[in-house]
């Protein structure tokens, strides 16, 4: 069976005028469909950077990344957004609900950006 996530020789470098920070260097990772994976390590070791790339919020400096068998390095912004909306879920360590919305409205919000989903169906999913 094809891996859900396959990363080969991934590198991520952050640049400023004076400093070059290597956040990831030669990362190899394969995650199968239905597999549970935990990442741990000290602050600054690259966990958040790797997860941001896996979640299509950032791009690697070098290396190969395939999600469901398709290369994602060169996807346009709109396609990356569509995949994030329909195929990837995020659970943040610190969450920020929108204070002017109810809890149900906060839960429903991501579904409003999913095309073709009727309001009544969204509300039923939230409940």
Regions found by a protein language model. Give the residues of each.
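ABC ATPase NBD coupling module
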Residues: 18-21, 72-89, 119-120
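Conserved ABC transporter NBD signature motif
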Residues: 63-71
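Short coil-to-helix segment of the ABC ATPase nucleotide-binding domain corresponding to the Q-loop/switch region
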Residues: 101-110
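Short coil-to-helix "N-cap" segments within the ABC nucleotide-binding domain's helical subdomain
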Residues: 76-79, 105, 114-127
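The feature captures the beta-strand-to-loop junction immediately N-terminal to the Walker
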Residues: 40-42
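A short, flexible loop at the N-terminus of ABC-type nucleotide-binding domains that lies
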Residues: 1-4, 13-26
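Helix-to-loop junction immediately C-terminal to a conserved catalytic motif
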Residues: 55
């Amino acid at each position: 069976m094809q891996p859900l996530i396959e990363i080969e020789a991934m590198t991520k470098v952050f640049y400023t005028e004076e400093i070059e920070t290597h956040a990831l260097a030669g990362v190899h990772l394969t995650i199968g469909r239905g597999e549970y994976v935990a990442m741990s390590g000290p602050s600054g070791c690259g966990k958040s950077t790797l997860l941001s790339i896996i979640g299509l919020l950032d791009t690697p400096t070098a290396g190969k990344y395939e999600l469901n068998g398709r290369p994602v390095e060169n996807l346009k912004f709109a396609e990356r957004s569509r995949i994030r909306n329909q195929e990837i879920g995020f659970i943040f360590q610190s969450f920020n609900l929108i204070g002017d919305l109810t809890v149900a409205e906060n839960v429903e919000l991501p579904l409003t950006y999913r095309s073709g989903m009727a309001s009544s169906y969204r509300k039923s999913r939230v409940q």
